[in-house]
């Protein structure tokens, strides 16, 4: 089965072709970072318009790269949510129009399920079950994953996501957009221990997160350093990254202890952070835990993860396929709501 995947939930337009027998055949991505940089963040209206411009050329690109035609497509998966409503509607409209024209089934995919399953696209995918740390600009969650569509929420952020805290800290330090990579790069030059920042909820006794207080602590320090030199900024960036990594790592391994699992999957844009990967790998070796990541190309939003997640869902539950023309989207969508029928009764 050849599945076309379409991702348009925020500021990346991603398309991919995934074959259930041959694997990933082609993927293409257009990022809107340059367009949004002058505004310091994503402008929803501009994002939607750019998706409209990019989606059909990218479709033709992946078909050409894979040596296939539209007639070869057996099913279409698209990001149904969560995300920006206008951006989601672009991908959903194209998916449904193309599916209607070709007479093939369609399936709406949860954006976070795409991230959750993206490490399975690697050459050495993790077997089930595992604990997943989903960490991005909009979400920070710990999930226990027993199989496709069988996910249990263990903990989540009560306020800001880790990626949002990175972006806000970047602005406070006068760095560019997107903030996460800029903060991480600056932190490379910082001295550990130069600033003391809190580790929110590190000893809370549960698996939830909170990063709003850490962001406020960074704001307080920047006000004290109104005439900060570059080294001061680097030191503060280092303190911030160390605090984030401490909390994410500690909670992840607490989740593994709680579930008894021995495999940790890290997904989402913040999962590409070098400092976080180094800490998790180090702790994994000490505690005999395998740690898995998606390829760096698939840490950010992409069509490959949507094509793959859609293919796995259609394989596990063919009755989920939709026919006809129905391009509803779900800008706010709880991952717990997408459990497969057999997972609900198990």
UniProtKB/Swiss-Prot annotation:
Annotated localization: Cytoplasm
Keyword Metal-binding (UniProt): yes
Principal place of residence: cytoplasm
Any Pfam family hit: TsaD
Gene Ontology CC entries for this record: cytoplasm
Residues annotated for substrate binding in this entry: 134-138, 167, 180, 273
GO BP annotations listed: tRNA threonylcarbamoyladenosine modification
Keywords: Acyltransferase, Cytoplasm, Iron, Metal-binding, Transferase, tRNA processing
GO MF terms, alphabetically ordered: iron ion binding; N(6)-L-threonylcarbamoyladenine synthase activity
InterPro entries: ATPase_NBD (IPR043129), Gcp-like_dom (IPR000905), KAE1/TsaD (IPR017861), TsaD (IPR022450)
Textual note on the cofactor: Binds 1 Fe(2+) ion per subunit.
Cofactor(s) demanded: Fe(2+)
Record-listed E.C. numbers: 2.3.1.234
Residue sites binding Fe cation per the record: 111, 115, 301
Enzyme class: transferase
Keyword Membrane: no
Family: Belongs to the KAE1 / TsaD family.
PANTHER family given in the database record: TRNA N6-ADENOSINE THREONYLCARBAMOYLTRANSFERASE, TRNA N6-ADENOSINE THREONYLCARBAMOYLTRANSFERASE, MITOCHONDRIAL
Record function comment: Required for the formation of a threonylcarbamoyl group on adenosine at position 37 (t(6)A37) in tRNAs that read codons beginning with adenine. Is involved in the transfer of the threonylcarbamoyl moiety of threonylcarbamoyl-AMP (TC-AMP) to the N6 group of A37, together with TsaE and TsaB. TsaD likely plays a direct catalytic role in this reaction.
The name this protein goes by in its record: tRNA N6-adenosine threonylcarbamoyltransferase
Organism in which the protein naturally occurs: Cupriavidus metallidurans (strain ATCC 43123 / DSM 2839 / NBRC 102507 / CH34) (Ralstonia metallidurans)
